[in-house]
């Protein structure tokens, strides 16, 4: 999967989550590599707004026809919103993994972004998984 997508302007984890900072909030989702590995996503369980999350805490569960995996937060913050569309259309993550955020955090700890991977670093990391 050396051609796995990774977009500039996003930060990545080795567990295949991404974070995109927009102003004072962060959007979190899963990468193209993750959705390919999971296969058809059938259900996503996410936290309620107001929940305080620390980096590497579980944000919920993603279930596919192949497996169930935990979604981990790349950074700390407070859940301000979850993507309501995913309740009725979890497959949106398969179609557009970078445009389909799952959780929106506020009061984010931007200092934690330095511990994440850039797009180039993530592509290199994924290329070694083949």
Swiss-Prot record:
Pfam families in UniProt: GCV_H
Keywords for the protein's UniProt record, in alphabetical order: Lipoyl
GO biological process: glycine decarboxylation via glycine cleavage system
CDD domains associated with the record: GCS_H (cd06848)
Cofactor binding summary note: Binds 1 lipoyl cofactor covalently.
Annotated GO CC locations: cytosol; glycine cleavage complex
Domain Lipoyl-binding: 25-106
Cofactor(s) this protein requires: (R)-lipoate
Task performed by this protein: The glycine cleavage system catalyzes the degradation of glycine. The H protein shuttles the methylamine group of glycine from the P protein to the T protein.
Subunit-structure text: The glycine cleavage system is composed of four proteins: P, T, L and H.
Database matches in PANTHER family: GLYCINE CLEAVAGE SYSTEM H PROTEIN, GLYCINE CLEAVAGE SYSTEM H PROTEIN-RELATED
Family label: Belongs to the GcvH family.
Name this polypeptide is given: Glycine cleavage system H protein
Encoding gene (name): gcvH
């Amino acid at each position: 999967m050396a051609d796995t997508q990774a977009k500039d302007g996003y930060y990545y984890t080795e567990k295949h989550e991404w974070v995109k900072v927009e102003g004072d909030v962060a959007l979190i989702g899963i990468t193209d590599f993750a959705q390919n590995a999971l296969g058809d996503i059938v259900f996503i369980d996410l936290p309620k707004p107001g929940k305080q999350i620390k980096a590497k805490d579980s944000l919920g569960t993603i279930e596919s026809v192949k497996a169930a995996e935990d979604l981990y937060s790349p950074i700390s913050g407070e859940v301000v919103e979850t993507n309501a569309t995913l309740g009725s259309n979890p497959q949106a993550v398969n179609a557009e993994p970078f445009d389909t955020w799952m959780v929106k955090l506020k009061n984010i700890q931007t200092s934690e972004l330095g511990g994440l991977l850039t797009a180039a670093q993530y592509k290199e990391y994924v290329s070694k998984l083949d």
